[in-house]
UniProtKB/Swiss-Prot annotation:
It comes from Halalkalibacterium halodurans (strain ATCC BAA-125 / DSM 18197 / FERM 7344 / JCM 9153 / C-125). Binds 1 heme b (iron(II)-protoporphyrin IX) group per subunit. Binds 1 FAD per subunit. The gene is hmp. Disulfide bonds: none annotated. FAD binds at Y194, R210, Q211, Y212, S213, F401, F402, G403, P404. This is Flavohemoprotein.
Length: 411
């Protein structure tokens, strides 16, 4: 943490704004992004505009600001949040000189949205608080940049990778196997981590960057990402980058990526059973963890539970089914929302509909386990609530958000 400190008066003013942030936080952050992109359009090359339109990015930022204000007396309490965001920043190649731009526009947004409630004293207190928090991020990210670049096979910023193989996994999911274009060493990674892919799409003014989980075990001589083609739904447009990768990136093409990042990683120590619960393309980081355990010959009980619309959309089923058939310590169960007649013949399909508490209870004979889950947010909220009701200790519960971090608290 930074050695800088805030005066007691500044802390009191910041804490006094907590109710205001609870009420107006998203309005402030939406205005902030609009203002910042207007004054600094070059930052559109970094931020995911789909998440902006969905409101997920402003909501995530509002939650972070609220948490910082609430814990201004003890910023150590939000270090896990800082670490998670810093991993994302390092992956996106965020630079220290961009923090003052964010601070300037955030304070201006507070003033313009809150009006008289944003007095000079309030804005000055938040300026001091922001500078302290920004310094924490800059120091944490500096260390992350150094670790990524100094690791064997590591690098800083972006590196060119060739698509060695492109493999269809389901109706909407495809894997890309990537190797360094320069033929040099490839950095290892922790199972569960992700990389950022940067693409320049013809006809688009700005570059696009997206994070994709590495979906295979490390030390295989390649990185594998497994990408769902986002088709769009209602007001949500089709995914710009996912459709570009599916339709226009082929074997032999080159992608620019950053070194692996992320703190959703496999904790290999211990003897408890490991339970993986995935929904849709949320299977990808869990497959990296699962394959790592299999590669290392771990004897702990491993239970893999996956939910999909049906077999048509289910990626990597054959691999999981074969492994479960061959390994006594591996158990595999599938839940299909709308199974086909063929799906009903699948011996691993155990439920039709959605994963619920009774289904998990029927599969898991021992709740004293380490749980890892990833998938759509409503799916994750369901799993989180079940584990909370079961009194599973927090240190045994691990999950990953795709996109801006949110909250799994029941609404």
């Amino acid at each position: 943490m930074s050695t800088a400190t805030l005066s007691q008066e500044t802390k009191q003013i910041v804490k006094a704004t907590v109710p205001i942030l609870a009420e107006h936080g998203e309005a402030i952050t939406k205005h902030f992004y609009k203002r910042m992109f207007s004054h600094h359009p070059e930052l559109l090359n970094i931020f995911n505009q789909t998440h902006q339109k969905q409101g997920r990015q402003p909501q995530a930022l509002a939650n972070s600001i609220y948490a910082a204000a609430e814990h201004i007396d003890n910023l150590e309490a939000i270090l896990p949040v800082v670490s998670r965001i810093a991993h994302k920043h390092r992956s996106l190649n965020i630079k220290p000189e961009q923090y003052p731009i964010v601070g300037e526009n955030l304070l201006a947004a507070m003033r313009e949205v809150l009006g008289d409630a944003a007095s000079d004293d309030v804005l000055e207190a938040w300026r001091e608080a922001y500078e302290l928090i920004a310094d924490v991020f800059i120091q944490v990210e500096k260390k992350m940049y150094e670790e990524a670049s100094q690791a064997p096979g590591g690098w800083r910023e972006f590196r060119s990778f060739v698509v060695e193989k492109k493999q269809r996994e389901s109706a909407t999911i495809t894997s890309f196997y990537l190797k360094p274009e320069d033929g040099k060493a490839l950095a290892s990674y922790k199972p569960g981590q992700y990389i950022t892919v940067k693409v320049t799409i013809p006809g688009h003014e700005h570059t696009h960057m997206r994070q994709y989980s590495l979906s295979d075990a490390p030390e295989k001589g390649y990185y594998r990402i497994t990408v769902k083609r986002e088709e769009g739904d209602g007001d949500l447009p089709p995914g710009i980058v996912s459709n570009y990768l599916h339709q226009h990136i082929h074997e032999g093409d080159v992608l620019e990526i950053t070194a692996p990042a992320g703190d959703f990683t496999l904790q290999e120590e211990g003897e408890r059973p490991i339970v993986f619960i995935s929904g849709g393309v949320g299977i990808t980081p869990l497959m990296s963890m699962f394959n790592t355990l299999m590669q290392r010959g771990v004897k702990r009980e491993v239970i893999f539970i996956h939910a999909a619309i049906n077999g048509f959309y289910h990626a990597m089923h054959d691999h999981l089914a074969q492994t479960a058939s061959q390994q006594e310590n591996v158990h595999y169960a599938v839940c299909y929302e709308r199974p086909t007649p063929g799906d009903r013949m699948n011996p691993f399909m155990k439920k039709e509909g959605f994963i619920d508490e009774s289904f998990l209870r029927s599969i898991l004979h021992d709740r004293e386990a380490d749980f890892y889950f990833c998938g759509p947010v409503p799916f994750m909220k369901t799993i989180a609530q079940i584990l909370k009701d079961w009194d599973v200790p927090e240190q045994q519960v691990h999950y990953e958000f795709f996109g801006p971090a949110g909250t799994l608290a029941s609404s």
